[in-house]
C-alpha cells in the first residue's frame, strides 16, 4: 500500500475540480487532484451533442487560458464554433490542462474519512492519500433523478436516465419514448433521429418549451462579483432568491435552443405535452405498450428518462462509505456551506451542484467554476503565508 501526503486533495477532475487545481497551482499550494479528467462529459454525454453555454464560460480563474484564447491559438473565433460542440469543448479542456500543467491521478476514491485532524482518502487500489484539506467536486452523476412514482410504473430494464443512455449505435429502426420536455429531452430526440430511430415520442407534464435562444448574459457579472462578496446570495430575502432562481429556471427550462428545431422537424417525432405515463407493460415480443394520460397508446422499444438531477450528498459513495457524512450539516440534502464552500467539517469543501442552495442556481452550471475555485483557495491562503496573494 502506498501512502501520499498533501495539503489539498481535490476529488473530481471535471470542470470544478480542474478550476480549483488551476487556482491552487497559481497560488503555490501543494495539491493532488484525482479522477479521470472530464469522465462524466466523455462517458455520460452523447457524441454529437452541443452545449448551451457560450465561449465565455471558461475554466481559468486568472482569465488567461480561456476558450477564446484556445480558439485564437487555432485561428478561430467564437463565431466559428458556436453552438459549442462537446468535441470542441473537450479539446479546449485538454488544452487548458496542458497550459496549466494539471495532471490528475486517474484513480477512484472509494471512501473518505477524518482521522486526527486530517483526512484519509482510500483508493479502490488500496492506496491512501492523507490530506489537510479536501475539496469534493462531485459533478452530476450520482444525483441523476428518477421519480419513485414514475419508476414504479416501468418494467425493470426498460428504461435508462439520459446520462446512462448515450451510445446510440443500436438506435436504428427502434422506437423511443423520452419522458421529459426540457433541453436534454429534445436534444436526445434529435440525436436518436439522426442515429436512425424509427420513431421518437416526447411526453412531458408541462407545455412544450419554446425554441428560443437562452439569455445568460446577466449571470456572469453576478457570479464573478461573488468573489468579492461571497455571501450576497444568502443575504437575499426568500422572495429575491426565488426570483433569481425562477429567472435562471425560465431561461434554462422554458426555452430550448433554436438549433434543435430543424433537426426535429420530422414525421418520426411526436410530442405529447401535458401528459404522463399511466401504465407501461412489456408484451410477449418485448415491446413496451405505454398508455398516456391523454388516452394515447404507443408502442416503443426503449424509454429514456430526461428527468434531471436532484442533490442528496448521502448518495455520494465516498461519503456514505466513510465516517464524515454524519458530521456534515445538511438541509434538504444539500451541505451547509460557509462563504468559502467549507462544510461544518473543518477543512472539507464541497462545490459544484451541491453548492446551489447556499450560493444560488448558478452553481449547477460551469460559469461558476472560476468563482468557487477562487473562494476555496482564498480560504486556504488565509491560513498560509506562502501563497502568491498573501
PLM segments and residue spans:
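Flavin (primarily FAD) cofactor-binding/catalytic cores of flavoenzymes
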Residues: 1-38, 81-195, 199-390
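Flavin (FAD/FMN) cofactor-binding and adjacent substrate-gating region
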Residues: 42-75, 217-237
Amino acid at each position: 500500500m502506498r501512502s501520499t501526503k498533501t495539503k489539498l486533495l481535490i476529488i473530481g477532475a471535471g470542470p470544478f475540480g480542474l478550476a480549483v487545481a488551476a487556482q491552487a497551482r497559481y497560488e503555490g499550494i501543494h495539491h493532488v487532484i484525482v479522477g479521470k479528467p472530464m469522465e462524466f462529459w466523455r462517458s455520460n454525454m452523447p457524441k454529437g451533442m452541443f452545449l448551451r453555454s457560450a465561449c465565455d464560460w471558461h475554466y481559468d480563474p486568472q482569465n488567461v487560458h480561456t476558450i477564446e484564447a484556445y480558439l485564437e491559438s487555432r485561428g478561430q473565433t467564437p463565431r466559428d464554433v458556436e453552438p459549442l460542440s462537446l468535441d470542441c469543448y473537450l479539446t479546449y479542456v485538454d488544452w487548458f490542462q496542458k497550459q496549466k500543467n494539471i495532471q490528475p491521478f486517474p484513480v477512484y476514491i472509494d471512501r473518505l474519512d477524518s482521522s486526527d485532524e486530517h483526512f484519509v482518502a482510500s483508493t479502490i487500489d488500496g492506496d491512501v492519500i492523507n490530506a489537510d484539506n479536501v475539496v469534493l467536486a462531485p459533478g452530476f452523476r450520482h444525483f441523476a433523478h428518477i421519480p419513485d412514482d414514475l419508476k414504479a410504473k416501468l418494467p425493470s430494464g426498460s428504461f435508462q436516465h439520459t446520462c446512462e443512455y448515450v451510445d446510440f449505435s443500436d438506435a436504428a429502426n427502434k422506437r423511443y419514448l423520452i419522458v421529459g420536455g426540457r433541453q436534454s429531452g429534445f436534444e436526445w430526440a434529435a440525436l436518436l433521429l439522426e442515429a436512425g430511430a424509427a420513431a421518437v415520442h416526447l411526453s412531458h407534464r408541462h407545455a412544450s418549451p419554446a425554441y428560443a435562444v437562452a439569455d445568460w448574459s446577466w449571470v456572469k457579472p453576478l457570479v464573478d462579483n461573488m468573489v468579492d462578496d461571497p455571501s450576497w446570495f444568502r443575504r437575499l430575502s426568500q422572495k429575491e432568491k426565488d426570483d433569481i432562481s425562477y429567472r435562471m429556471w425560465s431561461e434554462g427550462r422554458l426555452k430550448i435552443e433554436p438549433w434543435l428545431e430543424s433537426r426535429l422537424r420530422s414525421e418520426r417525432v411526436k410530442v405529447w405535452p401535458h401528459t404522463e405515463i399511466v401504465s407501461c407493460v412489456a408484451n410477449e415480443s418485448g415491446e413496451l405498450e405505454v398508455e398516456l394520460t391523454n388516452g394515447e397508446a404507443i408502442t416503443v422499444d426503449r424509454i429514456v428518462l430526461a428527468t434531471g438531477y436532484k442533490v442528496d450528498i448521502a448518495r455520494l459513495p465516498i461519503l456514505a462509505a466513510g465516517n464524515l457524512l454524519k458530521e456534515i450539516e445538511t438541509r434538504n440534502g444539500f451541505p451547509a456551506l460557509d462563504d468559502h464552500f467549507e462544510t461544518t467539517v473543518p477543512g472539507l469543501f464541497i462545490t459544484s451542484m451541491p453548492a446551489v442552495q447556499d450560493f444560488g442556481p448558478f452553481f449547477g452550471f460551469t460559469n461558476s467554476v472560476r468563482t468557487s475555485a477562487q473562494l476555496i483557495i482564498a480560504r486556504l491562503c488565509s491560513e498560509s503565508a506562502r501563497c502568491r496573494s498573501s
